[in-house]
From Swiss-Prot:
Pfam families registered for this protein in UniProt: dUTPase
Enzyme Commission identifier(s): 3.6.1.23
Name of the protein this chain belongs to: Deoxyuridine 5'-triphosphate nucleotidohydrolase
Catalytic activity field: dUTP + H2O = dUMP + diphosphate + H(+)
Pathway stated in the Swiss-Prot or TrEMBL entry: Pyrimidine metabolism; dUMP biosynthesis; dUMP from dCTP (dUTP route): step 2/2
Organism: Dictyoglomus turgidum (strain DSM 6724 / Z-1310)
């Protein structure tokens, strides 16, 4: 486990939390009531504030991901999936939601709208070569390993 600093902009909302003991990602909550028009009516997503700021340790990132239930039942997803939060970002976390259904979606303040997955990462150093080593797969892509 790692310790992550969090600042609640809206103290009436719960902290992001894990829905179950085995959950990998934390639920994020909407800070506002909102209406999300059907796909195509607004030409993109609607940016929803979550009411939190976080300070990830160096070497960590967070991904904002859709909630599977909202996607399956209502057609609601995160437009820029995954949304990337870097360790040096200190602003409020926002979720860019999109409605792929054909009816408006009414979101309520305090509802779970997305998930936050915190991951450790490594930075790279490029080592330029004249030619990459060969593999069995080679340059095969886009279905080359079968359907």
């Amino acid at each position: 486990m790692i310790r992550v600093l969090i600042e609640r902009i809206d103290k009436d909302l719960p902290l992001p939390n894990y829905a179950t003991h085995g959950s990998a990602a934390l639920d994020l909550y909407s800070r506002i009531d909102f209406e999300l028009p059907p796909f195509g009516e607004i030409g993109g997503g609607l940016v929803i504030p979550t009411g939190i700021r976080i300070a990830l340790p160096e070497g960590y990132l967070a991904l904002v991901l859709p909630r599977s239930g909202l996607a399956a039942r209502e057609g609601i997803s995160v437009l820029n999936t995954p949304g990337l939060i870097d360790s040096d970002y200190r602003g409020e976390i926002f979720v860019n939601l999109i409605n792929f259904s054909n009816k408006p979606f009414l979101g309520k303040r305090g509802m779970r709208i997305a998930q936050l997955l915190v991951l450790q990462y490594s930075r790279i150093i490029w080592e330029e070569v004249e030619q990459l080593p060969q593999t069995e797969r080679g340059e095969g892509g886009l279905g080359s390993t079968g359907l």
